[in-house]
A protein has these predicted regions:
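NAD(P)H dinucleotide-binding glycine-rich loop of Rossmann-like/cofactor-binding domains
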Residues: 67, 103-191, 239-241
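Cytochrome P450 core scaffold surrounding the K-helix E-X-X-R motif
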Residues: 43-49
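Surface-exposed amphipathic alpha-helices with a cationic face
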Residues: 178, 201-206
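Adenosine-nucleotide cofactor-binding segment
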Residues: 187-190, 205-248
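N-terminal Rossmann-fold NAD(P) dinucleotide-binding loop
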Residues: 197-198
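Residues located in well-ordered beta-strands
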Residues: 5, 17, 22, 34, ...
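Glycine-rich beta-strand-centered segment in the early N-terminal region that forms part
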Residues: 24-38, 52-110, 155-157
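Nucleotide donor/acceptor-binding cores
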Residues: 4, 93, 185-186, 210
């Protein structure tokens, strides 16, 4: 029986366990992906440090965490012939997919707010490693896309390094700026130039913002913000109060 390895999370501060699991049987409308690259998101660190609550109580068997990833199709369900945009899909193709799984039928989804779907995390299946499909996070050799999960082909010109974080930081800021109604010629102020802020600077610039301002206390982040598209940067060390920053 074919198997794959995964890192099992059992709780904050507990070392991950590398374990081997049988590959799940692929349902007719599901996809099994061989993960080629996974990133460590800031939320992964917060979870391991105990600084944030997991989406559900941690089962004694633990589960696979991580959500920033890219991979290649290892097995297609018999009913799957295309990605979510209707493009032909076959084994070996490189794909990326959302890390949440909205139902598409609730009030939030129908109102264009899939991020507020109450079942966007529970639809992955049981968060435990003692029952299939086992591979429900990025920190495993495989990832199981359940029936109905969004999946998209990756252009050859984009590297795994670029694509792996797309379904987290990049998609979050794109959605956030669209939700905020950013239009060409607007001014955007970014409160923080971490991973999300840097992506937001680049996206705001691409969306036509006339002025992008980044605020942070770390000089190296402010320098990166300029490289990512910020026109002006404001240091919290130099301007510590809101009044001083507004005057600046």
């Amino acid at each position: 029986m074919p198997t794959g390895r995964a890192a099992i999370f059992k709780g904050p501060g507990i070392p991950f366990e590398i374990r081997e699991f049988p590959l799940p049987n692929v349902e007719p409308d599901a996809i099994l992906v061989r993960v080629t690259m996974a990133n460590i998101c800031g939320s992964d660190l917060h979870l391991w440090r105990g600084e944030m609550q997991p989406p559900a109580p941690i089962h004694p068997s633990g589960y696979v965490t991580g959500h920033e990833m890219v991979g290649r199709v290892a097995a297609l369900g018999q009913n799957i012939t295309t990605d979510s945009l209707g493009r032909p899909l076959k084994e070996g193709d490189r794909v990326v997919y959302t890390y949440f799984f909205p139902c598409g039928r609730c009030y939030a989804c129908l109102d264009g707010l899939p991020n507020a779907c109450p079942t966007r995390f529970t639809r992955f299946g049981p968060r435990r490693s003692d029952v299939p499909p086992y591979f429900i996070g990025a920190f495993g050799e495989y990832y199981y896309l359940r029936p109905g999960h969004y999946v998209f082909l990756v252009p050859d010109e984009l590297s795994d390094e670029i694509v792996a974080p797309v379904n987290c930081a990049l998609s979050q800021v794109m959605y956030g700026l669209e939700l905020a109604g950013l239009r060409a010629g607007d001014t955007v102020v970014l409160q923080g130039a971490g991973g999300l802020g840097l992506n937001a600077a680049a996206v705001a610039r691409e969306m036509g913002a006339a002025l992008v301002i980044a605020i942070d206390q770390l000089p190296q982040r402010l320098e990166l913000a300029r490289q990512f598209g910020a026109d002006e940067v404001i240091s919290l060390q130099e301007y510590p109060t809101p009044e001083a920053r507004v005057e600046r």
